[in-house]
Amino acid sequence: MPRSIEPDEVLSILAHIALPPTAPYHEWGVLDAIRSELERGGIPTKTDPFGQVHARVSAGGAKRALVFAAHTDHPAFEVIEASGKAGKARVLGGFRQRVFPPDVAVTVHGDAGCASFAAILTEPVADIEPLHNSTTVCRIDAEKPLAVGQFAVLDLPAADVAGDEIRMRAADDLAGCALIVSVLLALRGERAPHDVHAIFTRAEETGLYGARLAAEDGLLPRDAYVISVEASRALPGAEAGRGIVVRAGDLHNTFSNEAERYLRVARERLAERGIPTQRALLVGGTCEASSFVRLGWTATGIALPNINYHNAAADGGFAPEIVRLGDLLSGIALGVEAALAAGEDADESWWPDVRITPTVIRERLQRDRPKG
């Protein structure tokens, strides 16, 4: 049976990765945390020309390699004008709150690691900037002087755990990053053939940019199958608490049936162990699998059902995103089993029975119509 990883260790990994503030183009703290967790576990990492972290675990002669991909950013704000303690901040990424609250508490950060400080966002104004997937500019008033290029994140808990519920400032997609790290750690010492690559991407929320660059520049093995790992909007049929979701597609694209084959094999194996999983077309957003599919790669996805996706509270304002520990553990188990299924190029159990039409049926359908 494949190695597993204890829930307490998973939560420790998640807490470490979730702690640093992050935003599109400002993911350095999260990337450092991911690198630290992997290297502490004996898994070497490398960094590509775009600052994205890569890792790999393998054993034996795997018949197919997999690439797990998750992004290290989350919608946030960037200071675009500054005059003392006041200025303007632009939304970066997909905050589409139905009601933008009159006062939004944030914390301000710099990429060089300067001490953070509190600020308030007010006076939101519609200002469309497609390059950064941005719809809004706000006034920002801070406790300390501001500087253009600083970024601000919602003043919410990084990761609070209450039973099975994990309330996060940025479950999308730091929970997905923690899932992949846990899969790699769980595969250490596994002797069955497997070849698993991971990429932790940047600037997904503003345009899938990191994944697009990886695909455009061939930064991953071209014959590997890519699996995007997300914390995507919980929907009917893809509900929190019912296991990881095998994602057949997203808002814009249907993914690869061939890449999904290994996930389906993994689902069968997990079902035998009583581990729940789901399968759905998730139209709540667009994920990095779309980048790879549209650029000619074989790709699919999995997702953690995410309540309050992109911090959208029920009242229209901002709230922590919520994922379930059970779903996270389900996703780790699915990732490990999919890696082993790819290593042996496994098929679903039912496929051999239907691969070739029975001769008796072929012959029956070839008979001429009886004459009356």
Roles of regions detected by a PLM:
Residues 1-372:
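N-terminal hydrophobic/helix-forming segments and targeting peptides
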